[in-house]
Amino acid sequence: DSLGRVNLTWQINDTKMVYATWSEGYRPGGINRKGTLPPYTSDFLTNYELGWKTTWGNVFVFNGALFRQDWDDFQFSYLGQNGLTEIRNANSAQIDGLELDLSWAATYNLQLTGGFAWYDAKLTANYCGWIKPNGEPETVCPNGTVDPNGNVVSGPQAAEGTQLPITPQFKGSVNARYTWDMAGGEAYWQASLSHAGRRRVDMREAETA
């Protein structure tokens, strides 16, 4: 398989530009550490991104990007009953996001910066927990379905729309740095604050209820 990338850039002037990117990527498959578990396959990503980089009056920088990522055979992991990490494939997932970063030279000595991000990361198909004979993750498993091991399931382990693991819905940070001359060099003090929203460790609903 081949991967593609297309990038278009418009340099509005010396201090402002916008860009659009379409790109593809993948993560290789592999074998789980526990030999009785099935191997996991490669997953594939298609990324659509629109962004900008701007400077205003040599004192204010404002950059940002809007993006969508579509995942096929999405890889995710969780801690299994034996204490080993298990990697599985879900059918499909999507991440919509907005990322912003700002910098302001408030005075000659004081620099203020901040970064903010919002993500809507979710499954776009049910995750049932097993693979179909054609190698694709099963997505249809209503209450009463019998899985390949003969167990009757009560529904998908993670339903369409479930938040993806590890990815918070929001994160942000701010930083202030004050610099001054001292003893022929420079000294500074710096203060930072960061926050990240709630994150799921395990995507499966029974494990996070």
Model-assigned labels for residue ranges:
Residues Q11-G25, S42-A105, Q111-A117, A121-Y127:
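Membrane-embedded beta-barrel scaffold of Gram-negative outer-membrane proteins
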Residues L37-S42, I87-A93, Q163-L164, T208-A209:
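Outer-membrane beta-barrel proteins
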Residues S2, F44-Y48, Q94-D96, P168-G172, ...:
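Residues that define the transmembrane beta-barrel architecture of outer-membrane proteins
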Residues Y19, G29-I31, F60-N63, D73-F76, ...:
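Extended hydrophobic-aromatic, low-complexity segments
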Residues L8-I12, A176-Y178:
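A structural motif corresponding to the C-terminal end of an alpha-helix
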Residues R68, N89-M203:
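Gram-negative outer-membrane beta-barrel transporters
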Residues G30-L37, F74-Q81, Y119, T124-I131, ...:
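Outer-membrane beta-barrel translocator domains and adjoining extracellular loop/strand segments
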